[in-house]
Amino acid sequence: MVLLPVGSVVKLEEANKKLMIIGILQKNGDGEIYDYLGCPYPEGFLDADNIFLFNHNDIEDISFIGYDDIERQLFIKNLEKELQKK
């Protein structure tokens, strides 16, 4: 699985509203790691009650893929190395 970049816009299964990805590999309060953190699209971040943790397999449709460059690719590569250590 390749993680989508921040800024990507997706629709989750059985959801009415699109989400924009604002974070990747985020932990919830119990320490469980999710692939993405998202906020409503097109509104953006409203408050902490309107952000959503979800996994790649929850995505039904990808409307837009966010910006990708060498900086992001190096970040993802380093992140993958750290995850393999655990």
Identify what each model region corresponds to:
Residues 28-36:
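Short, solvent-exposed secondary-structure boundary/capping segments
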Residues 3-4, 13:
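Short, well-ordered loop/turn sites that connect or cap secondary structure elements
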Residues 1-3, 26:
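Short, surface-exposed secondary-structure edge patches
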Residues 39-86:
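Intrinsically disordered, low-complexity, charged/polar segments
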Residues 17-27:
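Short beta-strand-centered aromatic/proline hotspots
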